A protein has these predicted regions:
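Generic detector of leucine side chains in alpha-helical contexts
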Residues: 11-14, 22-24, 50, 61, ...
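Active-site acidic/histidine clusters and adjacent loop/turn architecture
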Residues: 1-39
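Extracytoplasmic/secreted envelope proteins and their assembly/folding machinery
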Residues: 19-23, 47-51, 100, 104
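Catalytic cores and adjacent binding grooves of peptidoglycan-active enzymes
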Residues: 57-148
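Extended, low-complexity, intrinsically disordered C-terminal regulatory tails
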Residues: 26-68
Length: 148
């Protein structure tokens, strides 16, 4: 089970491989019941709303949902639904007695990493090119289906 801070946190579009990694991460005794998800999947419209707010100086940093990332497949934020129908990012909050460095260290064991400079809480299982390696995840490295 992946703990969320409130019912509005959407995890429905998380890639199944990412979801499995998160479940293993949250089950790890070093972080269990000490960390929760505060932001998950976003629709294009929600990402656009956050970006517009940011551009107007009324919101936090948010990626332009129309920006095509290097490599040409992913758009904008990894929180937003991508062309394959999945989302690849969550924001975490520490709710118990555990340090950021422990959270990051444990997450890395499951192939989940902070990827935005200055945002220790933003975690992804991959970048534009590939999935991050995992010491603790039984990865069977099946090729991703091509999406036109």
């Amino acid at each position: 089970m992946i703990p969320v801070v409130h019912s509005r946190v959407d995890l429905t579009l998380l890639h199944p491989k990412f979801k499995e990694r998160l479940e293993l991460f949250f089950g790890d005794g070093r972080v269990a019941n000490k960390v929760t998800v505060v932001s998950g999947c976003r629709s294009y419209a929600e990402q656009k709303r956050l970006y517009t707010k940011y551009r107007a100086g009324r919101g936090n940093l948010a990626a332009n949902p129309d920006w095509k990332r290097p490599g040409g497949f992913f758009y904008g934020s990894f929180h937003q639904e991508q062309p394959d129908g999945y989302s690849y990012a969550v924001d975490l909050r520490i709710t118990g007695r555990v340090s950021r460095s422990i959270v990051t260290s444990v997450a890395r064991r499951y192939g989940i990493r902070p990827t935005v400079k200055g945002e220790w809480w933003h975690f992804q299982p991959r970048n534009e090119n590939d999935w991050f390696p995992s010491v603790s995840f039984p990865d069977n490295d099946q090729p991703e289906p091509a999406v036109d």
